[in-house]
Amino acid sequence: MLITVQNGTGLHAPTDLAVLVTCEESPLPTEVAELLEATDHRGRFKQTTLLYPRGTLAPRRLLLLGLGKLATVTPDGLRQVAALAVQQARELQVATCTLSLQAHLTLPPAVVGQALAEGLELGAYRYQRYKTGLSSEQSFAVEGVTLYTSADEAALHVGVTTGQTVARATCFARDLANGPPNSITPAALGQAAQELGQRTGLRVTVLEPPQLVEQGFGGILAVGQGSANPPRFIVLEYGQPAADQPTLCLVGKGVTFDTGGISIKSADKMDEMKMDMSGAAAVLGTMQAVAELGLPQHVVGLVCAAENMPSATAYRPGDIITTLSGKTVEVLNTDAEGRIVLADGLFYAQRYKPQAIIDLATLTGAIVVALGQHATGLMSSDQALADQLIRAGETTGERVWQMPLWSEYREAMESDIADLKNAGGRYGGALTAAGFLAAFVGDYPWCHLDIAGTAWVERSLKPYQPWGATGVGVRLLVELLRSYGQ
């Protein structure tokens, strides 16, 4: 989508559709107000009124789109309104439209531009790769939007450029997580990473089973040993270590399909377990955005990719695994596989001596019970890092909620016959899972993001968030990296 920025109102520019964003306290332009037979458009948040102008107004159609009260406008509100605008344009089969925002917002123009661009790009997203025989109406896409503003045009343009970069990276992550498991295998994730490196200049290394065996990736190998699609460990590196810039490691769970293994899941909704690599997708998307934005930090993305299948060669309840760290793990439940692959990835991250390690994983159903689908669970060994993620969540709308990581949760994962066990009982499952992971991060500042409730939705929760994969984590992590240390 081409998004351009101009000064003015856009009400006198010929177009098939002009979208005028309105606020509750702001009067409509006189020539617009005259079109309303009753004062039924009050600018309430997400309120829409479609008009067919006459007189001096040039657009064929005019959509009034409410933003709510000026005092309560947030970047996420702008994001949602922009998504509604592009969806209305698509419904009307309008290829290019204008969006006018004349309200005097207290938000910086760059923030406004970024939020609007994200809303337009994310709101336009649809996953139709495997649809055949689509009609022109079904495949129709909006090609361009001109933003009209009374604010600083240059600053708004900077924000738009950033927003499009971040949104496209989010859509890349959505595509990976929406992809069918016969297509998105561990090898396919490795190929996607290599292609990403070719596009962006990221340095990419993909370790295959012989190298995993040689180097001792016992966790990833165990989870993947029951599948005909062998596991991979993927390293993506941006920038170089520097005395004046931090190194941050992002670790993603990449279980490309999770049957539960020998501890097999029920058939109901097992098809959705293709999204169990959403953490890996978020890492790949974030690394794309980091490279395209040219951020100053040294950032390393690590993807632990495996397929968890039941077979004669699958790992079993009762097995004891030796992980990359040398720590041993007693397997009580093969469906608690995410923490086992992450154990190798988190320990591997320590070799970079990072200022922060952040992992993302669709790890537990327990976090969904606790927080639903509106917040990602956050558990951390470092409060300063957690606070930065909380702020980034408020800015991006990818909100996180901090849960405790007390020593009792770590102790609950101790085994009688190995160093650790991979299941901690019925209660506090998200917390004991984090307690398990804590054993593999050393003394480095670390945050664990359990995205099991936010990575996939069965219905649209926000206009820019369609059903299916949400791409959660990309915008959150990019915001953290852009503001890191501030």
Protein language model annotation of sequence segments:
Residues M1-G254:
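Short amphipathic alpha-helical segment within the helicase RecA-like ATPase core
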Residues G190-Q486:
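A generic structural signal for tightly packed, nonpolar segments enriched in small/aliphatic residues
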